[in-house]
Amino acid sequence: MTRLNILMAASECVPFAKEGGLADVVGVLPKYLAHMGHDVRVVMPLYSRIDPERFGLERLPGVLVVPMGIMGNQYCGVWEGRLPGSAVPVYFLEHEGYYGREGLYEEDNVGYMDNDNRFIFLSRAAMELPKLIGFAPDVFHAHDWHTAAVPVFLNTLYRDDPLVGGAASVLTVHNMQHQGNFYPGAMEVLGIGWEHFTFLGLEKDNQTNLLKGGLYHATVLNTVSEGYAREMQTPEYGWGLDGVVRARSADLVGILNGVDYEEWNPETDPHIVANYSRSDLSGKKLCKRDVQRFFGLPERDDVPLFGLVGRLVKQKGIDILAEAIHRILALDVQVVMLGAGEPWSHFYFGDVRNEYPEKFGLYIGYNNGLSHRIEAGSDFFVMPSAFEPCGLNQMYSLRYGTLPIVRATGGLDDSVENFDEQNLTGNGFKFWSHDADALFDTVGWTVHTWYRRKDAMAALIGNAMAKRFTWEDSAARYEELYCRALRKRLGVGVFVRRFGG
C-alpha cells in the first residue's frame, strides 16, 4: 500500500522523558512503522530535563504560533531530533512557562495547577506544527488524555483545514484512570465553543474531561491489550467513562505492546553478570547469586527467589502484597523489591527489611541495570496489579525464564498462560481475586511447584522462554488500525484511490 504520513502526539517518549509505559510505546512503535515504509513523526514537549546538546537537537527556524482560545496566540520554538537508531523525526515544543519545570506532570505528588493549559497547548501545537514543517498527516495518533484534544480539534476547528482536515485520528488509551479533568473554564482555552460542553461531549460531572472528548471524537480507538479493551467497558475499570467506551465499542480494538528484544535478551544483556539461553541456563544461577549478593541475602541455590520491579502504588497491588508479605516470608523463600511510590510503602517495606534481613531485600528508587539483574536472577516475578492495561515486566520475565505470578487482569491475563499441572502447559501462575489471600495462595502454589515439581519447573521455564511479543506484530496491527480509520474518515472509495487498498 501507499506510504502513510503519521504524526504522533504524546507527553513522553523514551529516551527523552519517561514516567510510564506510554513513553516506551511512543519511543519504539514509530521505528517499526518506519521500517514498514511509513513516514512517522513525533511531537512532544521540551521539558527542562531534556538536554538538547546531549540528544543532538537542532532548533528549527521560525516560531510556532499556537492559538489558545480566550488566552489568545502563544508562541514556542521547535527543536528537531531523531529517535535513537532511526531516522524518525521528533519535534520538541520549547515553552519555558509550561515545560521548564522539574516534573512532567506534578511536583511533590501534586499535579501542576495549569496542566489543562499545558496539554491543551501540546494538542493545539500538534495541529499547527504541520504548517511549520511542511508535513501533511494522513493520521494523527494521540496518546492518553494529554493529547486527547487532538481528535477534538480535528473534528471541530480543523475540520475544513486544507492541510490536515482530511486526516483521521487514533486515540490510544494507556490508562483510563487518568482523564484530564479540569474546571469548566478549560473550554474557553480549547476555544471550540460551549456547545461541546455537554453529556455527549467533554462534560463530565460539570468539569471539562479531555479524555472523554477524545473518546467521542477520535475516528477509532485502541488500548494496549484485548483484555483491557473489554475491561474499559465495565464500571469497575471504566472510571466513570465506561458508557462512552461502550458506545464506541465497534471502533475499539486492543493491541498488545511488543518487547524490545534487543534490550531484553538474556543471551546478550550487558547488565547481567552472566548470559544464558533456553538451552543453557547455567548463567541464570550466577545471576541469582548476583542479586542475592547485591541485597545482602544468603547466596542459596536451594531457595526460590521472588522479584518485584515497579511503582509501589495500589494500582500495582502493593497494598495486598503488604498484607501478605509476612505470611510469604514465613515460607522458605527470599523476596527482593525495586521501586518507589506511595511514601507509606517505603516505610512499611523498610521495616519488613529490618525484620527479615536474610529473606527480604529492598531498593527504593529506580535503577535500570538493577531491574535487568532482578529479571535475570529471580525464579519468580510478582505482579499483583489491581488493573494493568498491558504491563511489560511479565513479558520481560518470560523471556528471562523467570515465571510471572500475575493477577488475571488486562494485559497480564492476555500474555500469561496459567500453569496446567496435568499437561505441563502454561508459562506462569495466575490468580483472579484482588486480595492478599489469593496472592498468598498462589505464591504457596509456586513454592510447592519449586520444591516438589522440578519436572514442571523445567517445562514452565522452557515454555516461558519460547514466548515472543514482537513489535513487528504490534506495528502491523497499528497499520491495520490506521487504514481502518482512514476508510471510515474518507470512505472506502477515496481510501482505495489514494492508498491502493
Swiss-Prot record:
Pfam families: Glyco_transf_5, Glycos_transf_1. It catalyses: [(1->4)-alpha-D-glucosyl](n) + ADP-alpha-D-glucose = [(1->4)-alpha-D-glucosyl](n+1) + ADP + H(+). GO terms for molecular function: alpha-1,4-glucan glucosyltransferase (ADP-glucose donor) activity; alpha-1,4-glucan glucosyltransferase (UDP-glucose donor) activity. GO terms for cellular component: cytosol. Its EC number is 2.4.1.21. GO terms for biological process: glycogen biosynthetic process. CDD domains: GT5_Glycogen_synthase_DULL1-like. It is an enzyme of class 2 (transferase). The keyword Metal-binding does not apply. ADP-alpha-D-glucose binds at residue 18. NCBIfam families: glgA. This is Glycogen synthase 1. It comes from Geobacter sulfurreducens (strain ATCC 51573 / DSM 12127 / PCA). The gene is glgA1.
